[in-house]
Amino acid sequence: MSTSGTLTSYYVDSLILPESEELSVPRYPSGPGLQHARQSASISDHSELGTCTFPSKPPVFGPSWSHVPAQFPGTVSSVYHHHYGHPQGPVGADTDGRYQSWLLEPMSGSLPMAGLPTTHHYGIKPEGLGTRADGALPGSHTALLLSDYANGTVATASPVEKDTLSGQAGDVSGEAEEKPGLDPSKSLQNNPVSNWLHASATRKKRCPYTKHQILELEKEFLFNTYLTRDRRYEVARLLNLTERQVKIWFQNRRMKMKKFNKDGAPKDE
């Protein structure tokens, strides 16, 4: 009995003790030794696959940007502003440790930067209005100075120039008076707007038949008042006429005969 009792207590203790140990000790210890063992085991398990190598990629950005001078040459536009953000250089390039202020300062010059998309207007060099005045009024010497144009003042013409301009205007009016007056009827006929009032008829001019042609047609009409198509073709070929001309002549000749029969014989007879 004592032997069996000790065995039962041993088995009971062996069954109960692991549960109590599980409560006090964490189920998955995370010691460095265990992690190293797991890593070595995983490496040994997949050692037959080999290592993976990736090609090196080029850097996204190029080398560092060079220092941009604060003052640009005079060929750069003073009113150009790109619609994209301006890249800023490295902070260390400035001796004072502050950002460059040339991005916010206006640049000198009046020429546009070619090759860059923009919708801004550029400064245009104002033309001297003297060339336009010379083209409009030949012989005049009036011109606007660029300084006067910028200040908003206009130079007035001298009395001599006024006399010259008035003389030119008088010559132009005299030439207009010397021209002979146009006939109003001819001017209306030449005017394309009123041309339809005097338009000629669209019909072709009447081409009279020769005596020989009329004689032959009269002979044919005495024999046949109506012509067949074949006979009309033969008559037209013999008289050097078209079939339409022969047909129209026979129609007119029949109408004339009907009118003569309707009116009756002349009273003189």
Swiss-Prot record:
Compartment(s) = Nucleus
Q: Where is this region: Disordered?
A: 159-192
Q: What Pfam families does the annotation carry?
A: Homeodomain (PF00046), Hox9_act (PF04617)
> In the UniProt record, which is one GO cellular component term?
nucleus
Main localization, broad class? nucleus
Instruction: Report which gene this protein is encoded by.
Output: hoxa9
Family membership: Belongs to the Abd-B homeobox family.
Which keywords has UniProt assigned to this entry? Developmental protein, DNA-binding, Homeobox, Nucleus, Transcription, Transcription regulation
For this chain's UniProt record, which GO biological process terms are given? anterior/posterior pattern specification; DNA-templated transcription; embryonic skeletal system morphogenesis; proximal/distal pattern formation
Protein name in the entry: Homeobox protein Hox-A9
Q: Which residues bind DNA?
A: 202-261
Q: InterPro entries annotated for this entry?
A: Abd-B_homeobox_TF (IPR050803), HD (IPR001356), HD_metazoa (IPR020479), Homeobox_CS (IPR017970), Homeodomain-like_sf (IPR009057), Hox9_activation_N (IPR006711), HXA9/HXB9/HXC9 (IPR017112)
Q: Per its UniProt record, what CDD domains does this chain match? A: homeodomain
Q: Would the keyword Transcription regulation turn up in this protein's UniProt record? A: yes
Per the record, the domain of life is Eukaryota
Please tell me the species this chain comes from: Morone saxatilis
Report the protein's function.
Sequence-specific transcription factor which is part of a developmental regulatory system that provides cells with specific positional identities on the anterior-posterior axis.
Recorded GO MF terms: DNA-binding transcription factor activity, RNA polymerase II-specific; RNA polymerase II cis-regulatory region sequence-specific DNA binding
Does Nucleus appear among the keywords? yes
